[in-house]
Amino acid sequence: MINNWLAVGLLVVSGILAFNWKRKHPYGQTVEIGEKPENGGRIRRNSACADHLISFLEDDEIYTLYDSLVKSCKKYGERKCFGERKKDSNGNLGKFEWISYNTYLERCEYIQQGLCELGLKPKSKVGIFSKNRLEWLIVHSASFIQSYCVVSFYETLGVESLSYVTEHAEIGLAFCSAETLQKTLDIAKGVKVLKTIICFDSIDKEHYNIAKELGVTLYTYDEIMKKGKEANGKHKHTPPTPDTLSTIMYTSGTTGPPKGVMITHKNLTSVVCAVSDFIKVYDTDVHYSYLPYAHVLERVVILAAFHFGAAIGIFSGDISNILVEVKLLSPTLFIGVPRVFERIKTNVFKEISKKPALLRTLFNGAYNLKYLSIQHGFKLPIIEKVLDLVFFSKIKQALGGKVRVILSGSAPLSFDTEVFLRVVMCCCVLQGYGASEGCGGDACKRLDDESVGTIGPPFASNEIKLVDVPELGYDSNGEVQTGEVCLRGPSISSGYYKDEEKTREEFKDGWFHTGDIGRWNRDGSLSIVDRKKNIFKLSQGEYVAVEKIETIVVKSEYVEQVCIYGDSQKSCVIAIIHPHPESCSEWAGSKKTDKDIKEICKNQDFIKVVLDDIIKNCKKSGLHGFEIPKAIHLTPEAFSDQNNLLTPSFKLKRHEIKKYFEDEIKKLYSKLD
């Protein structure tokens, strides 16, 4: 409490000394266009492109990803392009080793020539089933040269989902790694269309024998490279048009089989061109690429970084190495998802809690001062520089010390975590918003906007309108304009591959209906406030937005993951929780009890501690009584894509969680009744 009052006092004095400088908060970020539609509010565009939406870079004649590939390599030549860490003879990873833009283009040329030698025709589907690696990117870029359509797989998907995608997309040739080779062969057992498999690594005799029995031809990546070199450029390029299908992005799907989002060269090129209006990528930038390449957000970021000549360091694949690699690379751009940033915040405060009392007091005072200045919109340039130097510079080194922009995407970033990143990382923090159907880039906060909690205006490649959701009280023409976010423009997909029914359901009159509830703010920016599909009614008629509750519950030091569950025949919600392993261990140590997480999750005393902490946080955040979980079940097993409780992009599979914990849910409600 003393720290807070001290911070408030310093804030007032500092505000006077700083001549009441306010943080940048630009107004007029969007403009309304056209007449008011029959259904919903006025259409809004980014104020920078009121007259037109961007679909290409006319000055540079960039109309497709093929144009971007060729012209970027010509422009940046011998500059560093992609870097990765190689293992030595002892299996230890070394420093990042780099190839130039010229070398990258040369390898892309060899691969596409090699595929032509195999008889692969333009516009054929090419599957990629591997974790992040340089060869993945080379195959992806090589596909532009012959207008191939790339279909990527999350490495952790099961054979059933992989087989569905392979058959549905009619993939006759697929690339894989040594780790995924056996699973790829398993797919070929049941999917006869898959006839050729190319492994990025060496292949043992056993796998050659299995392939022979299946009637599948196996090659190594090096063999295709060799064929491409020997072809000596005899196969002419077959460049795509803007409307050529570039990729089919199969959404992982929280229910039912994956949907194949059709994404053209125009869709992706328009997003890449529009990115420069938000992040301002330079040829001096360095990007650390660790989100899966099957994730549309990471794909777009790489395409943009490549287009503007940045250097891109590739994740080695071991999660425990991420912070080591970040320090080695010292990126200027750090793109992540809320789960990563929440974990960074938890770890920082855990380390601070171990410091001596005096240091904790000083740090908390400095943190609260900067937090309050951001929260209330004051800018204290001199004082903030001193605080950054004395208190936060070492924390910033955790991300290499040179990060100038942090971008969070995939899911909403909580207010506290966004401010935390602004305070301790001493850089610009942006929230982006995007769906696979919108190529992952549909809205983003501007670099010159220092407010918190918005996703900014639309990209210059799409426009947005809100549609009424009367059953939930959302009015797109009300005093506060709210409604379902709908997208339209050059970057938006035309629909789902071979699925007209789903396309008609979610793409109406040219607009993609996201299922997200948005709110237009006074400055013209957009905020995501709810999820239409994850809102349900309790027995007393109250509506509950589960993601809003989960954002608050996960702030508890004891909670690693949470799924809020409710039933229309019940009057309250409950929570399925995977507790934070370290917090479990620390609590058990303090009570001198069994430290096995399975036993701790059954311990009624610990369950009460966790529930009490959750209730405290919920009340502090202003939740209504019906929104606060009345009972919890602790599970020692994390939600993951391996147990089918998470999608590969870290979204909860609520239907599967409900089935998986059906007995536990019944027991919790029976105790409450």
Curated annotation (Swiss-Prot):
Glycans are attached at residue 267. It holds the Pfam family AMP-binding. GO terms for molecular function: ATP binding; long-chain fatty acid-CoA ligase activity. It catalyses: a long-chain fatty acid + ATP + CoA = a long-chain fatty acyl-CoA + AMP + diphosphate. Residues 1-18 form the signal peptide. Keywords: ATP-binding, Endoplasmic reticulum, Fatty acid metabolism, Glycoprotein, Ligase, Lipid metabolism, Nucleotide-binding, Signal. Its main location: endoplasmic reticulum. GO terms for cellular component: endoplasmic reticulum; endoplasmic reticulum membrane; membrane; peroxisomal membrane. InterPro entries: AMP-binding_CS (IPR020845), AMP-dep_synth/lig_dom (IPR000873), ANL_N_sf (IPR042099), LC-FACS_euk (IPR045311). GO terms for biological process: long-chain fatty acid metabolic process; positive regulation of phagocytosis. The keyword ATP-binding applies. Its EC number is 6.2.1.3. Long chain fatty acid acyl-CoA synthetases catalyze the formation of a thiester bond between a free fatty acid and coenzyme A during fatty acid metabolic process. Belongs to the ATP-dependent AMP-binding enzyme family. This is Fatty acyl-CoA synthetase B. It comes from Dictyostelium discoideum.
